[in-house]
Amino acid sequence: MATKRLARQLGLIRRKSIAPANGNLGRSKSKQLFDYLIVIDFESTCWNDGKHHHSQEIIEFPAVLLNTSTGQIDSEFQAYVQPQEHPILSEFCMELTGIKQAQVDEGVPLKICLSQFCKWIHKIQQQKNIIFATGISEPSASEVKLCAFVTWSDWDLGVCLEYECKRKQLLKPVFLNSWIDLRATYKLFYRRKPKGLSGALQEVGIEFSGREHSGLDDSRNTALLAWKMIRDGCVMKITRSLNKVPTKKNFSILARNLNTIQVEEMSACNISIQGPSIYNKEPKNIINPHEKVQMKSICANSPIKAQQDQLQVKNNIKASLHNVKSSLPLFNTKSSTSVGQLQSPTLNSPIYMQKQGKNEHLAFNTKSKASTVGSELVLVSTTVPTVHHVSDLEMSSTLDCLPVLADWEDVVLLPASQPEENVDCTVPISDSDLEISFNSGERLMVLKELEMSSHENFGDIEETPQKSETSKSIVYKSPHTTIYNVKEAKDPGSDISAFKLPEHKSSTFNRVNANMSHPLVLGKHPLLSGGTKRNPCSPQAFPPAKKQPFTIHEEKPTSSDCSPVRSSSWRRLPSILTSTVNLQEPWKSGKMTPPLCKCGRRSKRLVVSNNGPNHGKVFYCCPIGKYQENRKCCGYFKWEQTLQKERANSMVPSHSTGGLTFSSPETSHICDRNLSISTKNSLRLRPSMRN
């Protein structure tokens, strides 16, 4: 006896607890958080044919109400559910659960069963004055009594009912999202792993009553086990909840999400200010003016104050949005061309800018509408973003050119995106310049030699002005601007005027579409509404040229080896040579072709959705899932950022610079000049079509 008593004191053996006959005697040793517990134990369809069945359906829905103060079962609920996906029960299922086929055939669908269960819950709520609460850490002292759900494992409410409601698109009651896992509580309280419900009952000295795997009997026995644990001093607490965690309780996730939003807003501001369509060079990529105003409002209301101040100092975006009409009444010409398309040509053609005065600035014309002239020309506004840093050199040039350039047009005519087949023009692409030829009678040649000031948004561009080699007479001359009156002889063999631009060497932005880069070249369409005469008293509207110098001149046959060329003899080049499609950085527009994985298939584009350092990042992986049968995943994985860097590095000269000579039956050749297409200007093929 002494040895047995010593063993009990050391904890080697314990006194066997004999349950009372009624199972309700005794009192709880500790104050419980919940006054009532509703024990649930579902029975579902099952098979023993060796196949993996993904969808199990509830066929018995039992519940018992346990009073944690007395240990009595105050109410019970039971309903047989008719399965919809597998209406015929297997022999194994009927033998295991004891449920007959006739019982489930006479049962109700799960939707009606949930409705009946909610009515039963509402009834006991009124009778017992109970409520369902989650996250309770202290006993309730009010007259309202708390209640919680209890299951033997997480399978009943966390797997079976959850996924069946999702498959059948049923609205699950909210109070079923939190429960107490009695098996996990048992393991934590007694510090041993139970061998099923019957094994746990045997360990605490309770004999299983009824039929095993019967839903109602399992619920009753689970309630007895819970009452035994309560009498032993176990405090029942919520162990599992499907409710979303409030954001205020998780500051790390909140801060990470705020940082992501701020980065997106910063990028949206930069894109909208620096030109949203600067990478979409085709004229069809025109942004809705309402969307443009919305994007500007996002940038103006961005929480990043430093970014906002920087943008306000450089471009005065906020003031220009609200004071376009009041402060700049001259700029009332409306157009649907996006700001990016008005801003990007400033790298090549100064006609997109208008001089307003010494201390006046330029502003956005956000309210714009489209108007078309004919079928080939588009009427657009020449209003561009604010430029604060204007050098004294440019201002002096502005004052010098005031008498002559006073009546410059407020609008320009741009060629359409793709000219018609009968358009009498040609656009040969060269490594050093771009030429567009049209018929003309008399042209003014403007030679501007202004310094290109450094700007953060455009980069440093240094170009050498091209010299004119035509016979000319000086009409007006200033320290930085010279205007010639060039009269061409009516030579039947030559009727050409060319508009040359220096090569754009900046790698910051892509090349502007060739059709959008030359607004002055209009063929026989005059630029001035009133002829070539200008009114010197009218206000000046030609902006400072923040770009490389350029030359407009008449080209005449000056060499014996240069055959005359008629504009009618020139054939329109294929569109693949005249348009510079954005192929240099296809991922800028967000439409990047997924690479090929190791197994030869097109990879799948996915986004990291879980919260972490890589949240929101895009990656590519093999389209074959890891768990697909009869297929093997090659394990391909690559971040989109890494892929972009690889593609940028792979854009090394891959095309040989061959000469191209454009001729016609009426012409032998053009000054023996071969148009060299450099690797920078050459077209890139899709990644899947490259050698």
Curated annotation (Swiss-Prot):
Outcome following mutation: residue 206 to T: In a colorectal cancer sample; somatic mutation
Binding site for AMP: 43, 213
Gene3D superfamilies tied to this protein: Ribonuclease H-like superfamily/Ribonuclease H
Active-site residues per Swiss-Prot or TrEMBL entry: 43, 213
A molecular function (GO) term: 3'-5'-RNA exonuclease activity
Keyword Zinc-finger attributed: yes
EC number: 3.1.-.-
Binding site for Mg(2+) 2: 41, 156
CDD domains: ERI-1_3'hExo_like (cd06133)
Protein known as: ERI1 exoribonuclease 2
